[in-house]
């Protein structure tokens, strides 16, 4: 079993630290300072970095980390080739911490965005899926992002999902506006408000939970997904 910890960074980012024993893998380091502090505090060995896409709030920590760890294995799609020395393609399989890690095509937010699924248990999805929401489609390729969400929906419902941003409360306000009232939505919103009032993360979430409260996962076709995304962009 892995120990997975969110490292808060910037205004609302989470850098995920995946730990096994004294080794750690870092996902999307937006800032090197909190990563290095976490490693030092817990006396860990940094063994690899996973990058989901090329936005600066997911990669700005890379120059400093590579200067400290020049031999580090860095996995990512071609769009992060300036940092990654192990370029991944959709449906590649990696072995990390004795887990089979599947690389899932997740384009739309960026052209080559990927997600990493550890053994049908843990999904690190960058900016594709958030609790109660999904990422903006900066490429304009709504089909690609809709398809990515369909791939996620096909996973086991117990999969834990680790998005890269704390957007839950604002996303749930939108969900409340567009979905029929439900006990699940009310309870999850109440829980999220309590957690944030204590400055605690609302993440990870689960696929089971998101299927109940995420309007983008409930979109039945591409047209409905596009309409929802446009609504959210102007919400």
Curated annotation (Swiss-Prot):
Belongs to the metallo-beta-lactamase superfamily. Glyoxalase II family. Thiolesterase that catalyzes the hydrolysis of S-D-lactoyl-glutathione to form glutathione and D-lactic acid. SUPFAM superfamilies: Metallo-hydrolase/oxidoreductase. Monomer. One of its GO terms (biological process) is methylglyoxal catabolic process to D-lactate via S-lactoyl-glutathione. NCBIfam families: GSH_gloB. Pathway: Secondary metabolite metabolism; methylglyoxal degradation; (R)-lactate from methylglyoxal: step 2/2. Zn(2+) 1 binds at residues 53, 55, 109, 127. Its cofactor is Zn(2+). InterPro entries: Clx_II_MBL, Glyoxalase_II_hydrolase, HAGH_C, Hydroxyacylglutathione_Hdrlase, Metallo-B-lactamas, RibonucZ/Hydroxyglut_hydro. GO terms for molecular function: hydroxyacylglutathione hydrolase activity; metal ion binding. Binds 2 Zn(2+) ions per subunit. This is Hydroxyacylglutathione hydrolase. Zn(2+) 2 binds at residues 57-58, 127, 165. It catalyses: an S-(2-hydroxyacyl)glutathione + H2O = a 2-hydroxy carboxylate + glutathione + H(+). Its EC number is 3.1.2.6. Keywords: Hydrolase, Metal-binding, Zinc. The keyword tRNA-binding does not apply.
């Amino acid at each position: 079993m892995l120990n997975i910890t969110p490292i808060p960074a910037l205004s609302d980012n989470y850098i995920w630290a995946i730990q096994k024993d004294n080794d750690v893998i870092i996902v999307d380091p937006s800032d090197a300072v909190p990563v290095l502090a976490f490693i030092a505090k817990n006396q860990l060995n940094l063994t690899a970095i996973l990058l989901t896409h090329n936005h600066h709030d997911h990669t700005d920590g890379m120059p400093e980390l590579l200067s400290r760890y020049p031999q580090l294995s860095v996995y990512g799609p071609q769009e992060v080739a300036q940092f990654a020395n192990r370029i991944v393609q959709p449906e590649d399989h990696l072995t990390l911490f004795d887990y089979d890690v599947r690389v899932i095509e997740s384009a739309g937010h960026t052209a080559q965005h990927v997600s990493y699924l550890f053994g049908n248990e843990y999904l690190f999805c960058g900016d594709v899926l958030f609790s109660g929401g999904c990422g903006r489609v900066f490429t304009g390729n709504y089909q690609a992002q809709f398809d990515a969400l369909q791939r996620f929906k096909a996973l086991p419902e117990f999969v834990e999902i680790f998005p890269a941003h704390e957007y839950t409360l604002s996303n749930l306000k939108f969900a409340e506006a567009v979905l029929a009232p439900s006990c699940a939505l009310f309870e999850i919103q109440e829980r999220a408000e309590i957690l944030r009032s204590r400055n605690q993360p609302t993440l990870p979430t689960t696929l089971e939970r998101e299927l109940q409260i995420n309007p983008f996962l409930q979109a039945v076709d591409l047209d409905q997904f596009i309409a929802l995304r446009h609504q959210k962009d102007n919400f």
